[in-house]
Amino acid sequence: MPQKRDFISIMDWSSEELINNLELALELKKKTREGQCPKELEGRSYGMIFHKDSLRTRVSCEVAIFQLGGHVLTMSEKDFQMGKRESVKDVAKVLSRYLDGILIRTFSHQVVLELAEHAEVPVCNLLTDFNHPCQLMADALTILEKFGRLENIKVCYLGDCNNVTNSWLNLASRIPLDLRIATSKETLPPEHLVKQVQDAGLSKLSIYHEAAEAVQDVQVLYTDVWASMGEKEKTKEREQLLFGFQINRDLLNLSSPDSLVMHCLPANREREITAEVMDGPRSIVYDQAENRLHAQKAILAQLERWRN
């Protein structure tokens, strides 16, 4: 039966739905490379709202919608001030009369939740200060491609616990992983998300304050910037707290011999990761970036299928 579904969080979809969507992403990637990408969004118009600067998210989403046969309109805060000049509810109601789906990249997670509550069309979260679910689907897709499986892969996230870390914890609540978080005592992940993983009982979750201990035998070393967009005033403080969690050659050598390095980008070379490692043979950051395109195609295609 047709239904309006959203993608605001990894937790919005079941384990089976997430796995099936990754399989769909692999299929769409293959067909796209063969020049046969199915036009799942043909005749559909999608609107994207950006309150944060973007390279990968904007380009990958616009190309994804185009490859699926749809039309996309991209808007910024300069076009309208949601929550100020117009209420979130009014924006949701009006855009639902024009568009077949809404994608949003913004600061406040509550704004996205409110938008989804009032929208009559699917809403896809492209990033908030709280989480980054589309990034995690691209990450999961990349790991699946490289290792042939996702379940029980040993992943170590190093550095500042942020929206990406939160989405890793969500994924570990849906799919069995050996997830290790290496961070300072001052930059821990939210307790309720740690408890969520523990209550789900699917994954092994460990938190370390020593990077060398955390990366023993891991298959994926993952990092992100130490200060997110809008947190530049915290850069010096974070450098002092997190300098021991940099991914460098010495740390990489402590991990599994076949381990790979991931970074969701943009990166600060010589801060959270050295140029030697990021540009080295075990780095898969550009494969990971490409998979934003294919993962988002699968997400949008699935939201459209549920509507029909």
Predicted regions and their residues:
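Positively charged, low-complexity intrinsically disordered leader regions
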Residues: 1-59, 63
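Phosphate/diphosphate ligand-binding glycine-rich loop within oxidoreductases
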Residues: 35, 39-144, 269
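Phosphate-coordination loops involved in phosphoryl transfer and adenosine-cofactor binding
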Residues: 41-46, 151-153, 258
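Glycine-rich phosphate/diphosphate-binding loop of Rossmann-like nucleotide-binding domains
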Residues: 51-64, 145-223
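Short, structured coil segments at secondary-structure junctions
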Residues: 68, 98, 118-119, 175, ...
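Rossmann-like adenosine-cofactor binding region
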Residues: 198-276
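Adenosine-phosphate binding glycine-rich loop
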Residues: 258-259, 265-308
